């Protein structure tokens, strides 16, 4: 696994995002990709940027649909990631909660989430900071 971290890769990451047409998806509408998986054309994020033009607005029908679908598919969970799969042109939602089926504990990190859902070593790691201030 190749792991790249720190600000020296930030410019490169933004360029690659444009080239791959990967856009931000996730917990917050203003989030930017923190992990990029070229093989699957997926971007996962935990920090803010303007790369969110395809993220469903909180007032949109798409957002409401996904939120309701998540509640039905994952009852009892409150936090989730939204991921847009470019090749299939579809949104999917996955839970992050204390009862997470992907990891025992108080939730799931972005890195663990990707490992469990995608099961691939082809991860380009862009940022070392997460919402808890520690390293992933």
Predicted ranges, named:
Residues 54-82:
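Short, charged, amphipathic alpha-helix that recurs within catalytic cores of restriction-modification
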Residues 4, 78-136:
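Domain-level recognition of nuclease-like catalytic cores that cleave nucleotide substrates
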Residues 1-27, 89:
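Acidic-basic catalytic patches of nuclease active cores, encompassing PD-(D/E)XK
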Residues 51-54, 101-103:
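A short local loop/turn or secondary-structure capping micro-motif enriched for an aromatic residue
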């Amino acid at each position: 696994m190749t792991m790249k971290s720190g600000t020296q890769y930030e410019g490169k990451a933004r360029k690659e995002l444009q080239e791959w047409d990967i856009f931000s998806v996730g917990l917050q509408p203003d989030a930017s990709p923190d992990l990029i998986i070229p093989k699957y054309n997926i971007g996962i994020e935990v920090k803010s940027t303007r790369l969110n033009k395809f993220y469903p607005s909180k007032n949109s029908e798409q957002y409401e649909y996904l939120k309701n679908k998540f509640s039905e598919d994952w009852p009892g969970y409150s936090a989730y990631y939204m991921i847009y799969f470019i090749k299939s042109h579809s949104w999917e939602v996955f839970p992050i909660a204390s009862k997470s089926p992907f990891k025992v504990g108080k939730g799931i990190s972005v890195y663990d989430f990707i490992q469990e859902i995608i099961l691939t070593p082809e991860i380009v790691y862009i940022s070392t900071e997460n919402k808890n201030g520690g390293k992933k």
